[in-house]
């Protein structure tokens, strides 16, 4: 009798496969609700295990401190602001209706006052391309144009940390430290390299699946490995 394979253990949601969110510093949401202007000064730039982009510690006018996403070109000592009537400059957060067409933006809200959901990874940016009534057209990093409510807020600028994917890890230890901060299962062992008790493709005198790799969508959890509900396998026919 076999036992649960790795995918089944991950699905259970135990601490081994759960993201270590107790190490994360902040959720990085926009400040306020957009009805009044708020400003603060950047006092430090830090690393957050939750993300690849750097974050900034900002001291607000009332003395409280918050973390924000850093955009390219801003540093310690600079002032950032939130509000509908603040200046359109790098690092400031405004409603989309207040940002001119052609501006680079990031950390865009999906709905007004949800804190920011889109375009938050290192080195990415979106562009305001169109305004029709209370809808704002934004060209996303994928190239697709997405329409937002005009009251949704966004930060002006490009997310800092661009070029990260061009730098190699060099050592397995570096990759290990990175993956340790996520819920990823790394390193990933091939099913054919496992014992027969650990995976449907395991065991045998040599490494081979030993059975068809295509599997139906509704198959029991321990058997849904390989090409699940595949439309086709092998080379595509033109």
Curated annotation (Swiss-Prot):
UniProt entry tagged with the keyword Lipid metabolism: no
Entry annotated with the keyword Mitochondrion: no
Transmembrane segments: none
Single GO biological process annotation from the record: cytoplasmic translation
Highest taxon of source: Archaea
GO MF terms held by the record: rRNA binding; structural constituent of ribosome
UniProt region (Disordered), positions on chain: 201-238
SMART domains noted in UniProt: Ribosomal_L2, Ribosomal_L2_C
Xref: InterPro entries: NA-bd_OB-fold (IPR012340), Rib_uL2_dom2 (IPR014722), Ribosomal_uL2 (IPR002171), Ribosomal_uL2_arc_euk (IPR023672), Ribosomal_uL2_C (IPR022669), Ribosomal_uL2_dom3 (IPR014726), Ribosomal_uL2_RNA-bd_dom (IPR022666), Translation_prot_SH3-like_sf (IPR008991)
Entry keyword set: Ribonucleoprotein, Ribosomal protein, RNA-binding, rRNA-binding
NCBIfam families: PRK09612.1
Record's subunit section: Part of the 50S ribosomal subunit. Forms a bridge to the 30S subunit in the 70S ribosome.
Family under the similarity heading: Belongs to the universal ribosomal protein uL2 family.
Function as written in the Swiss-Prot or TrEMBL entry: One of the primary rRNA binding proteins. Required for association of the 30S and 50S subunits to form the 70S ribosome, for tRNA binding and peptide bond formation. It has been suggested to have peptidyltransferase activity; this is somewhat controversial. Makes several contacts with the 16S rRNA in the 70S ribosome.
Protein name (record): Large ribosomal subunit protein uL2
Source species of the chain: Methanoregula boonei (strain DSM 21154 / JCM 14090 / 6A8)
């Amino acid at each position: 009798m076999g036992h649960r394979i790795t995918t089944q253990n991950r699905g259970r949601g135990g601490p081994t496969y759960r993201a270590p969110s107790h190490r994360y510093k902040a959720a990085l949401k926009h400040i306020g609700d957009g009805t009044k202007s708020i400003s603060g000064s950047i006092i430090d730039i830090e690393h957050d295990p939750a993300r690849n982009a750097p974050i900034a510690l900002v001291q607000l006018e009332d003395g409280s401190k918050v973390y924000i996403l850093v955009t390219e070109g801003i540093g310690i000592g600079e002032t950032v602001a939130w509000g509908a009537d603040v200046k359109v400059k790098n690092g400031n957060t405004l409603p989309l209706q207040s940002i001119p067409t052609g501006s680079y933006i990031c950390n865009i809200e999906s709905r007004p006052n949800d804190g920011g959901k889109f375009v938050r990874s290192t080195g990415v940016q979106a562009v305001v391309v169109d305004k029709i009534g209370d809808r704002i057209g934004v060209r996303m990093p994928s190239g697709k144009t997405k329409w937002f409510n005009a009251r949704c807020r966004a930060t002006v600028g490009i997310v800092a940390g661009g070029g990260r994917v061009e730098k190699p890890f060099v050592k397995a230890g570096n990759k290990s430290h990175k993956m340790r901060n996520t819920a990823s299962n790394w390193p990933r062992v091939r099913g054919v390299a496992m014992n027969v008790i650990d995976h449907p493709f395991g065991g045998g005198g040599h490494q081979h699946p030993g059975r068809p790799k295509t599997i139906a969508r509704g198959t029991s959890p321990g058997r849904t490995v390989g090409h699940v509900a595949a439309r086709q396998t092998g080379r595509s026919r033109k």
